[in-house]
């Protein structure tokens, strides 16, 4: 397989990416999207917002971004532990070996700021939600309820209960409590 005319997107990876070098790559990249990746979560975001944040906030944005991604990892680990996915019984009930995926989009099906399925979360493509992803203080405060939505996504993925299709959602929700 031969690939031509492609190059590696300047993704930000917690614990691996050097901040100053990443900032320079973002300023010059022509790719439209990148990933902001922790160990447990990955955000697919438009590069235009990263350029905007680096221009207005400089390297302090990158420092806060690193802290935020670490906090997001902690959120996901908390949900994993709540559902018994803490690697205590890695043979019988292993923790997922894939990150929670969060993708920004210009228009969501729900007409709200977020939408989730059992495997990924979609966020409305806005600067406000970039701040929610990249500001450690907002992550600590619940991240505009997005951390809660990650929990609902985990519930659908990890609850080991079968429901017949016609079962009312209100009944399923009451049982889950």
Report each predicted region and the residues it spans.
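Extended acidic/polar, glycine-enriched regions
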Residues: 1-30, 35
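Catalytic cores of extracellular degradative/oxidative enzymes
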Residues: 22-23, 32-177
């Amino acid at each position: 397989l031969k690939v031509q005319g492609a190059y590696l997107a300047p993704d930000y990876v917690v614990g691996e990416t050097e901040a100053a070098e990443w900032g320079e790559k973002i300023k010059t990249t022509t790719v439209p999207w990148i990933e902001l990746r922790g160990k447990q979560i990955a955000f697919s975001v438009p590069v235009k917002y990263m350029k905007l944040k680096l221009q207005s906030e400089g390297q302090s944005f990158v420092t806060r971004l690193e802290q935020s991604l670490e906090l997001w990892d902690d959120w996901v680990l908390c949900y994993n532990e709540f559902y018994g996915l803490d690697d205590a019984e890695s043979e019988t009930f292993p923790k997922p070996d894939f990150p929670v995926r969060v993708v920004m989009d210009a228009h969501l099906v729900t007409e709200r700021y977020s939408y989730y399925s059992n495997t990924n979360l979609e966020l409305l493509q806005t600067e406000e939600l970039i701040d929610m992803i990249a500001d450690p203080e907002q992550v600590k405060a619940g991240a505009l309820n997005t951390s809660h939505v990650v929990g609902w996504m985990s519930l659908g993925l990890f609850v080991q209960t079968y429901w017949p299709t016609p079962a009312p959602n209100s009944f399923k929700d009451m049982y889950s409590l």
